[in-house]
Amino acid sequence: MLVPLYEAVYQRLEVGSATRLLGLGCGSGLALLMAASRGAGVTGVDACAPERLALARERLLPEAWGTRARARTRLVDGEPADLASDAGDSGTAAYNLVTAFEPVGCVAGDSEGLGELLAGARPLVGRGVPVVIAGWGPPERCATASVLRVATKLADPLRGAGSWRPALRDDLEEVAQRAGLRPDGSGRVACPFGYADVDNAVRGLLSTGLFDAAVAATDQAQVDKELREALHPHQRRDGTVWMPNIFRYLIARTP
């Protein structure tokens, strides 16, 4: 769903064979796979979704790959601190690009978690290294925002850090400032969410983890029902589901 975002960032930063990329919250590894296809060495860390990390391993570490290609790819079920041995004393930073593509700005408190990830990655990079963070665009430019409100409504008994909130204009800049990073450019990218039918849309949205609290507060059947109703306005005559969205990215640099 965020492929245009990944492509825009990689093209702007000229990701290639000289790139040593650290992907924070790498999820299913699609962004890492795209970087690896450009020749980059990639490392991904994720402590929140073991099932998605397992998919990343299938994508990035297939047995068919040669030894050299596999050596330039690493996946870790954990936090950036688990890569502390990569810091080394050789004078060469372990990574020269850090990405955190999991977009902030739709769940209250998500930026705090991102700040912790960025802080954990700081010892692994040198000065002036680009750090890319991403966020949802304005609610009026994101059709999916109305669907995400279902998560808030159903998770009301667990109200708090998991509640939906609209993205704010300076979300990314504030995250960078708190992490001690210097903003050095930004952009907006259209990332429409398209699905073959409602069933596929429900499965795809549930896989993001944004509805986990709603499922815990009610049950799977109730969440499915509410999601289908919320998706109805976005269903086309041919049965496909189409939701235009705008995402922002910020490039910041380490001091």
Model-predicted segments: where are they?
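Hydrophobic adenine-recognition pocket in adenosine-nucleotide-binding enzymes
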Residues: 103
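A conserved beta-strand element that flanks and buttresses the S-adenosyl-L-methionine
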Residues: 99
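Class I S-adenosylmethionine-dependent transferase superfamily signal
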Residues: 35, 120-121
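Conserved catalytic/acceptor-binding region of the Class I
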Residues: 116, 122, 126-194, 212
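Class I SAM-dependent methyltransferase SAM/SAH-binding core
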Residues: 20-22, 28-87
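Conserved alpha-helix/loop element of class I SAM-dependent methyltransferases that forms part
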Residues: 1-19
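Conserved Class I S-adenosyl-L-methionine
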Residues: 28-30, 173-255
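A short, conserved alpha-helix within the catalytic core of class I
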Residues: 106-120
